[in-house]
Amino acid sequence: MEQSKRVSMMREKFEAQSNEAESSPPPNRKPPPPNKRVQTNGTSSLNSSGSSFVSPSPSPSPSPQQPVKRPLPSPGVNKQAPPALPTQPRPQQQQPEIPVRPTTPTRTPPNLINSNGTSGGSGFSSSSGNSGYSSSNNNNSNSNSSINMNGNHSNGLNGGSSNPVPMRKVSSPINIANGTTPPPPPQPTPSQQPQQSPSSASHNNTQHNIPSPPPLPNNKPKKLAPTAVPAGLGSIIGGPKTPAISPGSTSPSLGSSNGNIPISTTSTPITPTPPISVPLATSPNNSHKDSISNSNSNNNNNNNNNNNNNSSNATTSPPSPPVSNVGNKQDEEKKGFLSIFTNKKKNKDKKKEFSVGSPFNVKHNIHVNYHSVTGFEGLPKEWEVILQSSGITREDVVEHSEVVIDVLDFHMQQQQQQAQQEQQALMQKQMQQSGIPAHMLNNPKPPTIPIRDANKQPHNQLQPTPHQPPQHHHQQQPPQQHHHQQQQQQHNNNNNNNNNNNNNNNNQQSAQQQSAGILSQQQEQQLEEMMCGGAYDDEQYDLNNQPLPDETNVSLYDLVSQEDPTKLFGEGSTKIGEGAAGEVFVVTQLKTNNKVAIKKMPLNQQNMKLIVTEIGIMKSCRHQNIIDYIDSYLVGDSLWVAMEFMGGGCLTEILEQFNSVKLVEAQIAYVCAETLKGLAYIHSQHRIHRDIKSDNILLGSDGSVKLADFGYAAQLTKSKQKRVTIVGTPYWMAPELIRGQNYDRKVDIWSLGIMAMEMAESEPPYMSFPPLRALFLITTKGIPDLKDQNKWSDDFKDFVKKCLDKDVENRPEAKVLLNHPFLKTACNSNGLVPAIMEAKKAKEAHSKFSIH
């Protein structure tokens, strides 16, 4: 009686749950395809994954009405129907793990037979449309329900059979009973997998201790038509792929009216395991963290059915395996969390790697081409603006496109050099603040230049002049002997062996200094003899007598003096000029009480090579038309170059006062002749000045003319008999130099012709044009004639014309021009003194006027 009451109570609760489930909206997820199974009675069914397999079912326990026990079915024998009312739970048998592959179902599961012998609805149909599995026939729900040995109820696909059905991934139910949350489910071990109760019908029994009667024996389940689909099959939830069933597990139970899928777990067929509870989600917003729900409708359905679960004390199903999306999200969250530290680490590494240093091997290659239709290609916008502002017309571009490209290339290089100099100046200021010399940081190994003599000389020893006639070598034996002795002493000093009379280091140093002083004096005497009488004959400047030198490297420290310049010169100094290379001061030499010009140049990686070149050439050149080099000194992060002081200033100072002081042809011829003598001398040494202009022609108070500023000078060698580097001042540059073609010493002759026109007209041609336009005109149009042709003689005009010949082969050498008729009209040095004095007076008057 008590059992029948419980059955009736169970039926009433089931009907109430079914009615409540009918009011909820149908789910929008599809069920997993059923798995096809081969039953023992010869019929086949489908599991939830759609794969066909044969699974033995555990033998049912004998019921009280039928004391005779049924034998356990085998895979090859047809199963017998279980008794109507089993008196004890049936033992379960562990099933081997069978991989399940989801496929599309081709037919529906067979109809099940209820206890009355009539065919009930499909176990998948749901009359309420809820996410659970309720019976389509509520009247037969009790007869079709089965109770496992743990007291859990479950629904099955086959009446009376205990074949396992693979687990389906669904959302775990939400249980809000008494506001408590069950503990998280324990993780099953490989030896103990969650067991699932066998299913019998589409009835959901809410009691735990009352077994449901099995279907009538010997009733063969009917099959659905191939095209028939159980009601509500399309609304069943469609989860991810069904995982493989591990050994010892059974099929999940189906058919809970409220959408829950209670699962009972047993580790062995004899010893039952307690039901597994699931962590609950108290809010639909957080349900994606605690459950495997994929839609808001499932969350709502779970929340609506919590009370039914609590009232029936039904055990909740364990959570299904995690969805891949959740794992991906967790990986992304983990990756994003870890990326915070990795990004910080990268930023720290970047900060550590960042250091202020001097640029090296700076290149800024811009390839510009010209198309007749589209115009310039590859030209930056800023260069387009410069090209438009330079005054170069479109007709000029079309007619001389290659020349325009060469001119732009030169202008780009000039801009790059200027930017590099500004960057070096900024770095120099930073190094001055740190108290470290710039040349020590930027240039641990100073650049070298090719010089004539391979033997390194001390700082106070001059290089032997390369243009010595052969007879002087035979006459001047003592310098050669002293030179050999000094080399031997240097070799002995390096090997710590003293071959002289003195055996101590002090005597060695004094002997070396004494021999160096004797050599210096004798070389000076030799140079004076060479520059006196016959110094300008053709043999002296004959290039055929001077072979090309080999390239020999020398560093800056081999050229500078180790003495303290503050002890050699007076404290008082007067600034007389300032240029791009540095500032020029006038000081008094304490030893001779003569005025000396000191050029203070900051050292950086950009100008180091130019400085070394300038010092090397000035130190090895001794000529009356070249500025006398005294010595150079390293002071902090700058280089002091001491040279001869020229009281008359530069030639530009006279040309600036053109309104009050105008040079005549005799004076112009004198300056040109003296300049040509200096050029012929350096050309005989296979050197190029490359920056001949009025700013680099220094004048003495006595009217002497000397070349200065060898910063752009170049040494021609056997490996470099011509140069292609584009350097110089735009208005004085030769066309072949502008275009970067192979050029030689004749570029200095072109610059001399421009300087001659500058002395006649106070400025070089195209001075009123922008530099880019001037370069273009020099290359394409050449140099125009003198403005006032009647004012100048034919010899002067011919001299200028020969110097400015665009054909390099027809342009004469310096030694040839020295014999030009125009130079024979030159005055002496005294004839230039009045112009120098008048220019100084005009400059002083102008400065006083500007102050007041």
From Swiss-Prot:
PROSITE patterns: CRIB, PROTEIN_KINASE_DOM. Keywords: ATP-binding, Cytoplasm, Cytoskeleton, Kinase, Magnesium, Membrane, Metal-binding, Nucleotide-binding, Phagocytosis, Phosphoprotein, Serine/threonine-protein kinase, Transferase. Autophosphorylated at Ser-8. This may stimulate interaction with GTP-bound Rac family members which then further stimulates autophosphorylation and kinase activity. Its EC number is 2.7.11.1. It is an enzyme of class 2 (transferase). One of its GO terms (molecular function) is phospholipid binding. Residues 24-35, 57-74, 181-191 have a biased composition (Pro residues). The modification Phosphoserine is found at S8. Residues 1-334, 419-526 are annotated as: Disordered. Its cofactor is Mg(2+). Disulfide bonds: none annotated. SMART domains: PBD, S_TKc. GO terms for cellular component: cell cortex; cell leading edge; cytoplasm; cytoskeleton; cytosol; membrane; phagocytic cup; plasma membrane. ATP binds at I576, G577, E578, G579, A580, A581, G582, E583, V584, K599. Residues 570-823 form the Protein kinase domain. PANTHER family: SERINE/THREONINE-PROTEIN KINASE SAMKA-RELATED-RELATED (PTHR45832), SERINE_THREONINE-PROTEIN KINASE SAMKA-RELATED (PTHR45832:SF22). Regulator of the myosin I component of the cytoskeleton: required for regulation of cytokinesis, phagocytosis and pinocytosis. Belongs to the protein kinase superfamily. STE Ser/Thr protein kinase family. STE20 subfamily. This is Serine/threonine-protein kinase pakB. It comes from Dictyostelium discoideum.
